[in-house]
């Protein structure tokens, strides 16, 4: 029975707890302490107690004037705060580890007798990140020592941005998978990255190697700060850049032409109309499914309704083209090409269906001719067809390279979490890519397509940076070989998870506003899963909240103030008028007219 008891049932609705300093004499002059004041009626909450009223008695020394607060209360709740350290930790872990949104966290805390609003949860989530960042910097030397016990560290550098947001840049050690530092920068240009990388070098020393994407700014910054350090390219980013260069133009044509024909709107409108037509006849779709599975329509299925269901099923199949992807995104998934291919296939089947008379009456097939007529312009678009054919050819070449590099393969089922096949050596991959390069130069399209020649040049240019030999390092246990990871997927996965969490919370896809207000140290929450790092961070304490209690709350408040001051705000109605063409002239004209 005790297992079902929560803090909500242990105390009455509003328990009062008294706190006072743990000493009666001054720690400096040993004078007896006097009562300075009693703070009544402070609303407080912890996970263990739930909501309660804290009465704190404050002492002072009459000789030196020192003020003494309750250490017990300060160990539970930060100064000038209503919620305990354990609630801050609960919110942080719920948001970043369990991917709960604010509403779900609020309901969970409500069950623990903690009344809290979603805005307070958002505020405490920021405090969690600030506390984590402060602790991370306090144990920086111990982290460096731990990494060097493993022979050193391999610096993985990656970033994310959206629209006009700043670039959130993160670095981690590829060996221990510890996030080392984060910074918001206006761009990924070398001049912005160099100071950040210099601070990494100062804090953690020179890395064994650097792994990054193919950005020129990153390459220049790494070369400037980490001279004579091997720099490697993430295989995922290499393939992504290759795919965009290879058939990005064709993909753009497909997207623009399909939008011009308004084909999705046509299909959705027709589907909606057919749904209404089928509403009075129950079980039609199930009958069609049963017929396809058994290769025979059920006897109870009305033949007059079959054409309608057939068209409805074909349209649904075309609109479901996105399911054919493997979660990689473009260029690994070609959603517009797949949509067009399904559209062509459906058009062919509609013509075949039109020739079939289930009841010997052509009128019953009018639904086929109607949708075929609606799709006539897009199906007969010559430019669209040529672009699709070129793209199909180039995608086949791209998939051949993916297979050679043993990464982002559809059959793995790992989507963007694919770090490459660990059973395949880097030398084997290098050999297979060499075979692909030789095949490409002899292929029919090599002379015809400049994109093929550019692909070959990219392989030649980045050959050494793609295929890293194991690095020999000295450790306390002796000499070992360290193989740099082939991808930056650890950071990529975190950024995707983080964006998914915020999209779930906010309900919109654009992350520009989120990235502008997000604290730079947010990626440090990745380290919460790293047991070795957590031992360093806890420094002998049993819990994270115990470590948070050791941080001066004034430092945290300053961090919150700085984060707010760095966020620009704008009066909402102003957003509408600042995009008016000729706004400055309009302001002058308005005031001139008013003055006259």
Go through each PLM region and give its residues:
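Short Cys/His-rich Zn2+-coordinating modules
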Residues: 2-14, 38-49
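Short, flexible, mixed-charge glycine/proline-rich loop motifs
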Residues: 12-23, 49-55
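Acidic/histidine-rich catalytic cores and adjacent linkers
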Residues: 23, 212, 219, 264-596
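Short cysteine-rich clusters marking metal-coordination/redox-active sites
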Residues: 26-29, 61
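Basic, short loop/linker segments at the boundary and entry of helix-turn-helix/winged-helix-like folds
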Residues: 33-96, 150
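RNase H-like nuclease fold core
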Residues: 35-39, 111-211, 216-229, 245-252, ...
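Short, conserved catalytic/metal-binding motifs centered on acidic residues
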Residues: 61, 91, 105, 155-160, ...
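Short, charged amphipathic recognition helices of the HTH superfamily
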Residues: 97-109
């Amino acid at each position: 029975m005790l297992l079902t008891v929560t803090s909500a049932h242990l105390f009455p609705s509003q328990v009062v707890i008294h706190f006072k300093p743990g000493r009666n004499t001054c720690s400096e002059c040993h004078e007896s302490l006097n009562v300075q004041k009693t703070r009544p009626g402070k609303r407080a909450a912890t996970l263990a107690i739930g909501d309660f009223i804290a009465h704190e008695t404050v002492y002072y020394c009459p000789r030196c004037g020192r003020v003494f607060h309750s250490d017990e209360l300060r160990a539970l709740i930060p100064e000038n705060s209503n919620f305990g350290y354990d609630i801050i930790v609960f919110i942080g872990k719920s948001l970043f580890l369990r991917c709960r949104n604010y509403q779900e966290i609020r309901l969970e805390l409500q069950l623990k007798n903690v009344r809290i609003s979603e805005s307070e949860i958002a505020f405490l989530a920021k405090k969690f990140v600030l506390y984590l960042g402060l602790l991370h910097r306090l144990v920086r030397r111990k982290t460096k020592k731990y990494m060097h016990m493993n022979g050193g560290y391999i610096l993985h550098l990656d970033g994310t941005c959206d629209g006009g947001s700043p670039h959130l840049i993160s670095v981690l050690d590829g060996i221990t998978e510890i996030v080392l530092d984060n910074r918001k920068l206006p761009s990924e240009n070398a001049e912005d990255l160099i100071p950040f990388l210099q601070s990494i070098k100062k804090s953690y020393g020179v890395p064994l190697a650097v792994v990054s994407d193919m950005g020129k700014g990153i390459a220049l910054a790494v070369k400037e700060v980490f001279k004579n350090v091997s720099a490697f390219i993430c295989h995922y980013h290499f393939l992504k850049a290759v795919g965009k260069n290879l058939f990005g133009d064709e993909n753009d044509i497909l997207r623009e032409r399909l939008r011009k024909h308004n084909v999705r709107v046509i299909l959705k409108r027709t589907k909606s109309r057919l749904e209404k037509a089928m509403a009075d006849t129950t079980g039609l779709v199930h009958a069609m499914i049963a017929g396809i599975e058994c290769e025979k329509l059920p006897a109870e299925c009305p033949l007059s309704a079959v054409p309608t269901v057939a068209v409805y099923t074909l349209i649904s199949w075309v609109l479901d083209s996105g399911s054919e992807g493997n979660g990689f995104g473009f260029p690994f998934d070609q959603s517009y090409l797949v949509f067009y291919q399904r559209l062509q296939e459906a058009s062919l089947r509609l013509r075949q269906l039109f020739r079939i008379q289930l009841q010997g009456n052509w009128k019953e097939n009018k639904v086929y001719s109607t949708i075929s007529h609606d799709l006539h312009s897009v199906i007969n678009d010559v430019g669209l067809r040529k672009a699709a054919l070129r793209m199909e050819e180039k995608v086949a070449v791209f998939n051949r390279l993916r297979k050679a590099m043993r990464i982002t393969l559809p059959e793995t089922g790992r989507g963007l979490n694919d770090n490459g096949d660990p059973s395949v050596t880097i030398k084997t991959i290098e050999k297979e890519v060499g075979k692909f390069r030789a095949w490409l130069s002899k292929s029919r399209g090599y002379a015809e397509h400049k994109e093929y020649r550019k692909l070959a040049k990219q392989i030649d240019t980045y050959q050494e940076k793609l295929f890293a030999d194991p690095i020999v390092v000295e450790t306390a246990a002796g000499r070992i070989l360290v193989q740099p990871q082939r991808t930056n997927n650890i950071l990529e996965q975190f950024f995707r998870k983080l964006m998914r969490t915020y999209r779930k919370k906010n309900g919109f896809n654009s992350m520009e506003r989120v990235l502008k207000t997000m604290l730079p140290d947010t990626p440090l929450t990745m380290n919460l899963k790293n047991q070795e790092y957590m031992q360093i961070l806890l420094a002998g304490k049993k819990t994270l909240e115990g470590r948070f209690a050791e941080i001066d709350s004034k430092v945290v408040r300053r961090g919150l103030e700085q984060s707010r001051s760095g966020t620009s705000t704008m009066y909402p109605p102003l957003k509408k008028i600042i995009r008016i063409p000729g706004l400055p002239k309009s302001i002058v004209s308005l005031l001139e007219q008013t003055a006259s």
